[in-house]
């Protein structure tokens, strides 16, 4: 044991990031062995040829099929493509079994979505070296559930997540801080975990094209361009990440809100709506940072005479983006503001849940122009009508209608 202990750092942590490969497709294959080795896609209504590819097997990817591709196009590339409709009940059960297996190795597990999670194995040296533990986890998932995964091994969450993306399927990658200059820095900033297309564009605007340039960039210029989040990204580009694996994290987030007390009473609607938009942006950032979504938006209006009005809107579908939160909040505002001057304004997202894979699929569609003109729910209805995929809408609702939700089940078992 003492020899094995020497394979762990004297200071610092050992973090694993377990990421299931093509999760939905892999679950389908595990439950129907005849699909093994064949091009498979999980998508919408095959008969009407209106589906969108949610995920596909690696065999399908060899034909050029990708997530978000229209089903008709995928069929053109691969006429023999096998299509399955999404089965969220099946996927949730497989996810629960996955986390049960992970819990054999450590109690320090942080699920971040239906198909991925972090483990802190710093104190698990009695089980073997970090690489041996990763191999045992990978083999257990493959043998017992027939589900492949990739695992990243690193000293912090960011590097572990980055490492797990490097080898798929069935990869195990060790990423140390000393590996960063060679393995991470040459990549474009858009390839870095946590940087989306818009953030990458902003960084490009200040002549930051690579992760190395981000790591070595001027902190003040980066902060001025994208705020405090930019400084956090710069630290991670240097390999620094102080976040802990927190098994109780989800239980702490019953709501996410922000409010602002004004130095003087305000009655200009434009200024108040501008503040409402800024508060919505702040709530959105906090939700996305924690991979959460909301099914209820609430506003608080405190008037100059201390009267307080709190109103909320129940939503049919999960939201997390700034524009959707602001849309719900501004509607409430227009319905309930009586015209008097305001001293405090607040926006809160409640009924918080994980941004599970079924909810994430709504990210896959680009209906930005429609979203500017139509309510979010109308856009989602349009997606369902056009692509024949009502499960994208109802799947997220199904997660919430269980007597004991998937999230609660995980929390009660592992947290």
Curated annotation (Swiss-Prot):
Q: How would you classify this enzyme at the top EC level?
A: transferase
User: Segment Disordered: which positions?
Assistant: 238-260
GO molecular function, a single term: DNA-directed DNA polymerase activity
Write out the biased-composition intervals (Polar residues): 246-260
- Site annotation Substrate discrimination: residues: 24
User: Cofactor note from UniProt?
Assistant: Binds 2 magnesium ions per subunit.
From which residue to which does the signal peptide run? none
State which Enzyme Commission number(s) the record gives: 2.7.7.7
Where does the record place the catalytic residues?
116
Kindly list the cysteine pairs connected by disulfide bridges.
none
Where does the UmuC domain lie? Answer: 15-196
Q: Which Gene3D superfamilies match?
A: 3.30.70.270, 3.40.1170.60, 5' to 3' exonuclease, C-terminal subdomain (1.10.150.20), DNA polymerase, Y-family, little finger domain (3.30.1490.100)
Query: Where does this polypeptide localize?
Result: Cytoplasm
Identify the main location. Answer: cytoplasm
Alphabetized, the UniProt keywords read: Cytoplasm, DNA damage, DNA repair, DNA replication, DNA-binding, DNA-directed DNA polymerase, Magnesium, Metal-binding, Mutator protein, Nucleotidyltransferase, Transferase
Q: According to its UniProt record, which reaction does this protein catalyse?
A: DNA(n) + a 2'-deoxyribonucleoside 5'-triphosphate = DNA(n+1) + diphosphate
List cofactor names only. Answer: Mg(2+)
List positions binding Mg(2+): 19, 115
Give the matching PROSITE patterns.
UMUC (PS50173)
Question: Where do transmembrane segments lie in this chain?
Answer: none
* One record GO biological process: error-prone translesion synthesis
Q: What's this protein's function?
A: Poorly processive, error-prone DNA polymerase involved in untargeted mutagenesis. Copies undamaged DNA at stalled replication forks, which arise in vivo from mismatched or misaligned primer ends. These misaligned primers can be extended by PolIV. Exhibits no 3'-5' exonuclease (proofreading) activity. May be involved in translesional synthesis, in conjunction with the beta clamp from PolIII.
SUBUNIT field: Monomer.
Could you say which protein family the record assigns here? Belongs to the DNA polymerase type-Y family.
Matching PANTHER family, A to Z? DNA POLYMERASE KAPPA (PTHR11076:SF33), DNA REPAIR POLYMERASE UMUC / TRANSFERASE FAMILY MEMBER (PTHR11076)
* The protein's name in its UniProt record: DNA polymerase IV
